[in-house]
Amino acid sequence: MGQDTLLLQTHFGTVRDARPSDTDSIVQMVGKLAAHHGDAVTLTPEDLVRDAFGEKPWIHVLVAETDGELIGYAALCGLIQLQFGVRGLDMHHLFTEEKIRGRGIGTALVDACKTKAKALSCRYLMVGTHPDNHKAQAFYEALEFMRRDGHPPRFSLRLEN
């Protein structure tokens, strides 16, 4: 999976591939994101280790870090348009700590997701939002994601390799 890969050096610190030692912090952030959406969390550290760091990883997790503290993450899942032989990634989660939102961390995580997708020979990123999350929708559109037809809102970004 390329753990310990630095994807982006930023004004706040770094965005890199998550490592097993990040598990507890990531699980806590997943809980915060779920609470924000009114969801119950059943993810355990063991689940995350299996899915992100196990023998057959199912997801890619990127983390934003400043001064040794994790302040955000993105979780990516594989997609494919098999009839075209085209790979993509779904940005399943994007989260930054509430106290530091609006400082470019989310944008840096999206940029790192693009880098990761290109490294995996993907040609697009997809992301969905809650229908009432207009702030997130505007965020993705500002980053040149294209709104797709359908409900709930979905956005895609073509990547040039």
Located regions from the model:
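Short acidic N-proximal helix/loop "leader" segments that mark the beginning
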Residues: M1-L8
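Acetyl-CoA-dependent GNAT
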Residues: Q9-G13, D17-S21, S25-V86, H92, ...
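Acidic/polar helix N-cap motif
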Residues: R19-D22, E97, N133
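A short, internal acetyl-CoA/4′-phosphopantetheine-binding micro-motif in the GNAT/acyltransferase core
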Residues: L94-R101
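Conserved acetyl-CoA-binding loop-helix of GNAT-fold acetyltransferases
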Residues: G102-T115, A138, A142
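Conserved GNAT acetyl-CoA-binding A-motif
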Residues: A117-G128
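Conserved beta-strand-loop-alpha-helix junction that forms the acyl-donor binding cleft
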Residues: M126-A136, S156-E160
